[in-house]
From Swiss-Prot:
Family, similarity comment: Belongs to the thymidylate kinase family.
Name listed for the protein in its UniProt record: Thymidylate kinase
Keywords, sorted A to Z: ATP-binding, Kinase, Nucleotide biosynthesis, Nucleotide-binding, Transferase
Enzyme Commission number(s) of this protein: 2.7.4.9
Keyword Transmembrane helix carried by entry: no
InterPro entries reported for this sequence: P-loop_NTPase, Thymidylate_kin-like_dom, Thymidylate_kinase
Domain of life: Bacteria
Gene from which this protein is expressed: tmk
Residue positions binding ATP: 11-18
Length: 211
């Protein structure tokens, strides 16, 4: 039985969501006694990390969009049963850096795959599990890509090599999801100073936990 809460973190490339999450968690631990788990997709467990390597390898430019989607779904399922569900059943607060919405935005809006097919696969992989809250960090594609190019410590992956048009479609996909699920998905302006973005994210998380 699930007694914990699931919060997902989403955003186009360069939105800074991972950095925000790194700063958010220590602040949250000062305010709540609940055990907190942070993890990521694709990855989080050994099998899913191996799948991540396949997906992001810059040499795999021939990867078909449906192959890409199915790899993400496989990684999601293994991660869920091995790590996420046990934590939720133990009453933990779980943060996932990317989850079901990424598939709809990237493989749906970005790659042009049928949204209904992606939603069915998400349902199949998660047994219908949905986040209690999704923090969507929004940033224009031009700014996001400029941040990526300016970050010399970041390892370039296959998705970073995509055209700006695909990144723009991904962002539109996210914005459409936010309109479709206004109670679950909170849109946060990620062009603001980092401290302000973290503060807004913290407010939304505390509102969920203290409701």
């Amino acid at each position: 039985m699930i007694t914990g809460k699931l919060i997902t973190v989403e955003g186009p490339d360069g939105a800074g969501k991972t950095t925000v999450l790194e700063q958010l968690i220590p602040l949250l631990k000062q305010k709540v006694a609940q055990d907190i788990l942070t993890t990521r997709e694709p990855g989080g467990v050994a099998i899913s990390e191996h799948i991540r390597e396949l997906i992001l390898d810059i040499n795999h430019t021939a990867m078909d969009p449906k192959t890409e989607l199915l790899l993400y779904i496989a990684a999601r399922r293994q991660h869920l049963v091995e790590k996420v569900l046990p934590a939720l059943e133990a009453g933990q607060l779980v943060f996932i850096d990317r989850f079901i919405d990424s598939s709809v935005a990237y493989q749906g809006a970005g790659r042009g795959l049928i949204k209904a097919d992606i939603q069915w696969l998400n349902e199949f992989a998660t047994d219908g599990l949905e986040p209690d809250l999704t923090l969507y960090f929004d940033v224009p594609s031009e700014i996001g890509l400029a941040r990526i190019n300016a970050n010399q410590q970041r390892e370039v992956n296959r998705l970073d090599l995509e055209t700006i048009e695909i990144h723009q479609r991904v962002r539109k996909g996210y914005l459409a999801l936010a309109k479709e699920h206004p109670k679950r998905i909170v849109t946060i302006d990620a062009t603001k100073p980092l401290k302000e973005v973290v503060s807004v994210a913290l407010e939304h998380v505390l509102a969920l936990l203290l409701a």
